[in-house]
């Protein structure tokens, strides 16, 4: 309806570029077009929570680190916090596409490069990127031959898998929502997408 039959045919696949995400990974950019919020909607607005709690970019990464620690991974090394890029620098141009780096496995030099925006999409992306980082950290002690993911697809799947853990229960555990809000959100399957 929004774009018309000439752009998006009524019968057929939705062109991936219409999602507003170059990799077709998320529908969040067209959420307002495909979901009409009803008066009894119970979806959780993570962006608003981040704003209301005045959570900064580093704190967003700390939430993700705490998640990985809670499932048995070791803390990130101090060098991660010293050498990663979390906020877009004002003094130079950088490519802001989020990425994870394993620069020196012998010294556990792990970093992310990301111009974090204080919103839900980046909160999820941080968890994805730290999925890569913790995966790197898990195999850095192995012989050089084995210091790599099983394949690139598996590395991406690992990062994406962990983002699926950002559920109402998780948001309750990190004190973003109350138990009642989490339970109400779980009743709205569209809101969980």
Predicted regions and their residues:
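Cation-handling catalytic/transport regions enriched in His/Asp/Glu
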Residues: 1-193
């Amino acid at each position: 309806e929004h774009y018309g039959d000439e752009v998006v045919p009524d019968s057929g696949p939705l062109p991936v570029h219409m999602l507003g995400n170059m990799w077709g990974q998320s529908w969040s950019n067209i959420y307002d077009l495909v979901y009409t919020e009803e008066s009894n909607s119970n979806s959780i607005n993570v962006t608003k929570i981040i704003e209301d709690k005045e959570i900064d970019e580093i704190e967003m990464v700390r939430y993700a680190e705490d998640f990985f620690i809670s499932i048995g991974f070791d803390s990130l090394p101090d060098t991660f916090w010293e050498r990663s890029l979390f906020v877009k620098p004002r003094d130079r141009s950088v490519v802001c596409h989020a990425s994870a780096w394993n620069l020196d496995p012998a010294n556990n030099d792990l970093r992310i490069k990301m111009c974090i925006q204080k919103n839900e999409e980046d909160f999820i992306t941080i968890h994805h990127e730290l999925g890569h980082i913790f995966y790197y950290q898990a195999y850095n002690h192995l012989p050089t031959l084995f210091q790599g993911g099983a394949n690139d697809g598996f590395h991406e799947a690992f990062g994406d898998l962990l983002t699926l853990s950002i559920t109402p229960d998780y948001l309750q555990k990190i004190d973003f929502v109350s138990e009642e809000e989490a339970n109400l959100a779980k009743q709205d399957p569209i809101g969980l997408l």
